[in-house]
Amino acid sequence: MYRKVDVPFELYEVEILDASEEELAKISEEMGLALSVDEMKRIQDYFRQKGRNPYDIELQSLAQAWSEHCCYKSSKYYLRQYLLEASKADYVISAIEEDAGVVEFDDEYAYVTAFESHNHPSAIEPYGGAATGIGGILRDVLCMGAQPIALIDPLFFGNLDTPYEKLPRGTKHPLYLLKGVVAGIRDYGNRVGIPTVAGMVFFDNSYLTNCLVNVGCVGIVRKDRIIHSRAGGAGDLFVLAGGKTGRDGIHGVTFASAELDEKSEEEARGAVQLGNPIMKEPLIHACLEVVEKGLLTGMKDLGGGGLSCVIGEMALAAGFGAEVYLDKVPLKEEGMAPWEIWISESQERMMLTVRPEHIDEVLYIFQKWDVPATVVGKVIPEKITRIYYKGYKIYEMDTEFVTSGPEYCRPYVARKPEKELHEEVEPPADYVKTFMKMLSHPNAAFKEWIVRQYDHEVRASTVLKPLQGKMNFETHGDAAVIKPTRSFRGLAITADVNPWMCKVDPYWGAASSFDEMVRNLVAVNAVPHSFNDCLNFGNPEKPERMGEFVEAVKALGWMAKGVGVPCVSGNVSFYNETPYGAVAPTPSLLGVGIVEDVRKAITSEFKGRGAVILVGETHNEFGGSLYSAVMGQRCHKVPRTSPERLKTYSDAMLESFRKFEVKACHDVSMGGLAVCIAEMSFGRGLGFEAARELSFVELFSESNTRWVVEVPESVAEGYAEFFRAKELKAEVIGYSGGERLDFGAFSVELGEADKSWREGLTKFL
């Protein structure tokens, strides 16, 4: 089925014209294409029309372009139906269409956001997988002409107390993965000089055999310097800038488009890319300089699929084709076959399109920064991609055929609620013991061990940091705030999802995650402005898994349209599944808000001598809650929300910040009101005394659309009345100060609770 072509390098003709379905399946498996028989038959028909067999490089190119990772073949239909309408707003400059979303920041500047997954590589090699995830997301923002200003990293692992002897075969321990991933993010982000300001870490045994590493980036760009991921016109030159091309990252996207198993590490280690932050830093400077001087017509990063995807996509987006001279590509090693060069995903590479009259100046600037840059091709009028290698034509395909991957409307089964919504949840026999267990649970406990490894202050623009409060008393903040320009206008950044809620009910779990994202932005006095999603799910070929995805997407679209917060960019990561099961549905969200004046941003810790007010409504809703996890109770009613209620309360909260002096604000989320108040107390070592006995449901329910606000006692009643006048619920529930957490129903020493919370994660390290 493979015939070596008579050329002075490795090139094979693959005999598919008369191949049977069994032979097509065998070719796909042997070449690592990860294409179905139907997809191979479509390729077979194309080359029958051409009257020839394809070369190996052509089949490999199609495998990259048609992978789940690159063409979204299982998700496009449902994203278009339920979510893409939520990408529209007057202030959105570019959404969904390119590598990153571009949104108006002020009259002069726009901010750029991108959010991706690097799950499979991190499960195989946690340090390298996480590091190259950071490298890739930086390039997504850079290719829009933006200076990266902040990194975000939601991480998901199996339970840290998993006994080694109970690990499935071929699985790395969650503690090893956690340490490797955190080190990879730390070393890459710190060395390239971009602050890591937000994120989350979540532990659940659905991630035991398939951890998730999601990475996000925010950048800033002058509106007149925004550049797009497309060529300018025929005659433009393709310039490959950055790192050399090697055998690392080959079949990265096809590896990411299949389930993991116990053989994955042995078979797919070469699919993990190797990052180099020391090359990335000058590459960023050089790219921004040529953008500032107006020397480029287009720019795009080399991510999934490498050269095989970037050149065709840039050319076709402008209505043209490409001619490539593959032997001009700088290599890390000799002896690479043309197909390996074409699909390698080696890191730190950018593709630029440049008019011929500007090429010398562009190459000089990259030489000045000591970054390799080479002309590797040109844009041609025909919508065809041709590749030459050492004088031989080895590839010729219609660019539209390569980039028009399949699209499936996969069948799905929507999960039905397991029980009636009205369910009884047992209160704890011992309130204090239960509360201390909740505080020390790794999902609620202090994340200082992780946060302190990241430089969140480099670039000197981080106004609100991930940890807030008095030195040595810091607590978790709701969102970071960045001051990206000389004005006092700022960006608030948060990352949110609750996989436990999504596991119980994907629809209401996703809606609750959106609600929490908005709450976190509002809590720091930011107007919710846009969001990105990173949708992590199992095998889409299984109707139950596809049902989880569809329900989550429906919920996000409903919430986004109703609240008026557009989805500007995103990512879908399927096949997060092994023979031992799929990950919990995990629709990670990256939220961005506008802070009109960073000097008026609000932190989460109690300041003392204040009245504590609960804003919002509490219901008996324990599905996916920390309380139900700690107590081992199966609760099925995930907290409800609605875009109308969320919008009404959010607007009222922001108005109240303008009208009243507000000392502190924190959203009520994991652990409910009790854990929320405890976190606010820990930030300055100030206790809390309830004004009345708070009930079990009030303390531990995780109902949505709630905040705890600290105000001076003198304005407390006026503040609560402000909400009541709008027919919204607000109540003075207590006062800050003292050395105890006294909730009426129970009371604990603040120091004991603080110790339990701060040691909840570190006791496993």
From Swiss-Prot:
Keyword field: ATP-binding, Cytoplasm, Ligase, Magnesium, Metal-binding, Nucleotide-binding, Purine biosynthesis
GO BP, sorted A to Z: 'de novo' IMP biosynthetic process
List of residues binding ATP: 72, 533, 570
Record: residues binding Mg(2+) 1: 116, 571
Protein's UniProt keywords contain ATP-binding: yes
Entry GO terms, CC: cytoplasm
Residues binding substrate: 117-120, 139, 273, 345-347, 573
Any Pfam family: AIRS_C
Residues at which Mg(2+) 2 binds: 140, 301
Active site: 69, 118
Enzyme's top EC category: ligase
Recorded catalytic activity of this chain's protein: N(2)-formyl-N(1)-(5-phospho-beta-D-ribosyl)glycinamide + L-glutamine + ATP + H2O = 2-formamido-N(1)-(5-O-phospho-beta-D-ribosyl)acetamidine + L-glutamate + ADP + phosphate + H(+)
Pathway membership: Purine metabolism; IMP biosynthesis via de novo pathway; 5-amino-1-(5-phospho-D-ribosyl)imidazole from N(2)-formyl-N(1)-(5-phospho-D-ribosyl)glycinamide: step 1/2
GO-annotated molecular function: ATP binding; magnesium ion binding; phosphoribosylformylglycinamidine synthase activity
InterPro entries for the chain: PRibForGlyAmidine_synth_PurL, PurL_linker, PurM-like_C_dom, PurM-like_C_sf, PurM-like_N, PurM-like_N_sf
Subcellular location(s) of the protein: Cytoplasm
Subunit structure as annotated in this protein's UniProt entry: Monomer. Part of the FGAM synthase complex composed of 1 PurL, 1 PurQ and 2 PurS subunits.
PANTHER family the UniProt entry points to: PHOSPHORIBOSYLFORMYLGLYCINAMIDINE SYNTHASE SUBUNIT PURL
HAMAP family reported for this sequence: PurL_2 (MF_00420)
Protein family membership: Belongs to the FGAMS family.
Purpose: Part of the phosphoribosylformylglycinamidine synthase complex involved in the purines biosynthetic pathway. Catalyzes the ATP-dependent conversion of formylglycinamide ribonucleotide (FGAR) and glutamine to yield formylglycinamidine ribonucleotide (FGAM) and glutamate. The FGAM synthase complex is composed of three subunits. PurQ produces an ammonia molecule by converting glutamine to glutamate. PurL transfers the ammonia molecule to FGAR to form FGAM in an ATP-dependent manner.
Stated name of the protein: Phosphoribosylformylglycinamidine synthase subunit PurL
Phylogenetic placement of the source organism: Archaea, Methanobacteriati, Methanobacteriota, Archaeoglobi, Archaeoglobales
